[in-house]
């Protein structure tokens, strides 16, 4: 009993102390309320309202527990839940502040600055001349009338349809130019005049217009004739006089044969064959000059051992353009874009069908690019391309 009395006495003493403390606090609050200005009261009310609004927003979760509210919302939930600011967001915010502060002052480094010297490499690449071709040192007459040396490789030329000069107004004129490359001057090798006699095509080839007007001129090179259907073209040399009578004999250099148009379920395309005389290959560095183009034997139809046969490559069918096309990607980057045409062709030897010996591609309405190599001469390649350009009755496309 004595212990319980002591506990009760302690409780009563504590209650008295608490009453005195609460009384003093209430008097202090009363004094504070009297000294508070109306502005402080209004601000305290506003802060309380803001706290209540934040608490109500934080209690919208399904769990009922308050969550921390920040200004960064989730991109995946559409802002329904609030996320804590990450280090990436902090970096983005800092960068945006830097960009805004430096707006209007940040500029790109100009091309002419010292730090962009590496870009200036391309400014002069197009103006520099292309390296000289291996055949560029050959004279015009040798490049035109003699077989191209074996070690020269491929020679590139352009065929251009031009306006007829005075005295040649009833036909078409084609010129043969070398394609030396960018930054180099092209050379004019030959000019050809096309006319028809009794419906048959005749081409006369010379180095200039004077040779076209007079076949006895030194610049005259030769001629090419065709049959009525245009299925066979004969390439002739300029000819020599034989015997005391002085009869003119024109050696036959090559023959071009066109087969009738081949029609398939995917379309139609042309096919051609070329016959050349066999000859020994010559090197450019040989002490002797490059040899003259050989002549076909008189019995070239029967004597097949002395002739070389070239056939045109079969074009592939393009499903997008719905026409037959040839692949000219092996030409490399020459700056000339070849258009699809039925007059385009690629000739290969029967012994080496993978290597293209002569090819022609249309560049535009009046220009064609050709590439030829041994055993062709420039004159033979020029005439074969003119035969493909010429219109024919045997070809319906």
UniProtKB/Swiss-Prot annotation:
Instruction: Give a brief account of the tissues where this protein occurs.
Output: Mostly expressed in roots, flowers and siliques.
Looking at the record, which segments are called Disordered? 1-46
Output the superkingdom of the source species: Eukaryota
Identify one Pfam family in the record: Tub
Q: Where is the composition biased (Polar residues)?
A: 17-28
Q: Where is the composition biased (Basic and acidic residues)?
A: 1-16
* Family listed: Belongs to the TUB family.
Output this protein's name: Tubby-like protein 8
Which gene is annotated as encoding this protein in its UniProt record?
Answer: TULP8
């Amino acid at each position: 009993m004595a212990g319980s009395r002591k506990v009760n006495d302690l409780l009563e003493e504590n209650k008295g102390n608490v009453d005195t403390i609460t009384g003093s606090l209430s008097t202090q609050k009363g004094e504070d309320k009297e000294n508070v200005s109306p502005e402080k009261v209004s601000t305290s009310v506003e802060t309380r309202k803001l706290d209540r609004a934040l608490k109500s927003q934080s209690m919208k979760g399904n769990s009922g527990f308050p969550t921390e509210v920040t200004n960064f919302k989730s991109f995946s939930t559409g802002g329904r839940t609030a996320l804590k600011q990450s280090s990436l967001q902090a970096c983005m915010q800092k960068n945006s502040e830097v960009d805004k502060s430096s707006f209007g002052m940040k500029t790109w480094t100009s091309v002419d600055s010292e730090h962009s010297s590496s870009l200036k490499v391309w400014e002069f690449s197009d103006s520099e001349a292309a390296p000289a071709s291996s055949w560029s040192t050959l004279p015009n007459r040798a490049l035109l009338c003699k077989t191209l040396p074996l070690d020269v490789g491929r020679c590139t030329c352009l065929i251009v349809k031009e306006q007829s000069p005075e005295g040649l107004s009833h036909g078409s004129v084609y010129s043969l130019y070398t394609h030396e490359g960018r930054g180099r001057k092209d050379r004019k090798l030959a000019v050809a005049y096309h006319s028809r006699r009794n419906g048959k095509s005749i081409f006369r080839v010379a180095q200039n217009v004077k040779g076209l007007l007079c076949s006895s001129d030194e610049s005259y090179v030769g001629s090419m004739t065709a049959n009525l259907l245009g299925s066979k073209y004969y390439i002739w040399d300029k000819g020599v006089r034989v015997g005391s009578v002085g009869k003119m004999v024109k050696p036959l250099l090559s023959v071009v044969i066109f087969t009738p148009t081949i029609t398939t379920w995917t379309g139609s395309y042309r096919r051609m064959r070329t016959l050349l005389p066999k000859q020994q290959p010559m090197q450019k560095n040989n002490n002797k000059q490059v040899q003259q183009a050989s002549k076909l034997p008189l019995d070239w139809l029967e004597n097949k051992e002395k002739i070389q046969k070239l056939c045109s490559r079969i074009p592939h069918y393009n499903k997008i353009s719905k026409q037959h096309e040839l692949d000219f990607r092996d030409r490399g980057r020459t700056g000339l874009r070849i258009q699809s045409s039925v007059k385009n062709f690629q000739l290969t030897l029967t012994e080496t069908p993978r290597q293209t010996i002569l090819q022609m591609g249309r560049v535009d309405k009046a220009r064609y690019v050709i590439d030829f190599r041994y055993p062709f001469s420039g004159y033979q390649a020029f005439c074969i391309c003119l035969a493909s350009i010429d219109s024919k009755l045997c070809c319906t496309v």
